């Protein structure tokens, strides 16, 4: 029987609560993020896990962390999440190219890695509501840099007892990402563009979450907020699964021997995906280095190099927009863990970040980051990587994966480390068609993104994913754009408050 795991806020104002309560709440009342009181070790060996499919692996990982869900509840959630919505039975296949293993996390309904967690979150959430006798309708409030929004909308559309509101930076997502969101069906969905960047959207959402007056108004009308962003532990736990799965799969295929270390490279924005790899390592997966790959918004690269987190810098719009982030929310969980689970210290750092835009960690905390390596890739390096690997191997990747691939090349040059390496491939190249075509030297500004998708399909011999072809002529249903100061009004209008 797995030992119970309870969750508390990184900022410490809240006592321990069960997993289902943490998932329901999303963000702690003090603005902190929920973290487990201990990280359990895998109970089955990796050899045993290697005999399981993706769904079986998911159960083995999730039952250890979501301990108040019954076996029946978890298996129900897992079987409904990882089904024919994915275009491959493997759910997360691995491709080898140019000496690295690409863990493809984009085979779900919206062709981005967010599907891996957001296809199960609605089931975890509605199960949690039943378990906790929640009387209110759950309002999912989400900020997106492009991918989370669509994946959350697809997951929650027409789910009884829920509504979903997504804010995105009007001028900070790719045309295909925007088209995916604004054509979303479902009577319970609301998509709003904001005049501002992703950090503005995320800060606005966090503010709404912690607004006590608004919470009271909502409660009176039978609503309560929760989150589909990676601040929700229900997003993070399912992401641990694919790191366990990838190791077990490489083991099963004889590409590594039992116990061999692997390195993991993750293109990083909000720090959730790489934090899941850190948790997988702490659960017993032999991961050596956790290589954190940034684009030109290299606040995390600087943090790993100097120990200072400083968001006081220019926000750069890049060809990897899901990583255009200067306030990396999930880093707070890592700060909490490396401070020795010290909530007071974490709250102090986050206070400094809010007030001064920066903080510096202690030498002792820095010594606990030895397993992390921070790297970054410029736009040119990103584009060169897409082209070089495609011309050399025929393997096509999107801009975010290319950032990771470029950083991996730099890492091996710098260190000579030959450890087998898994690179998280986080989106289909068809989500960022224009940038990928530009990288291949076949860009054409006179053509639309869908026309370029046809050409990319021809060049790469890869079929256009259903997620792109189905939105070509879809009706635009969401046209609202507001200033970043008007987010509360927009929420109230949608909920009829």
Task: Show which residues each predicted segment covers.
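PLP-dependent amino-acid enzyme catalytic core
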Residues: 1-497
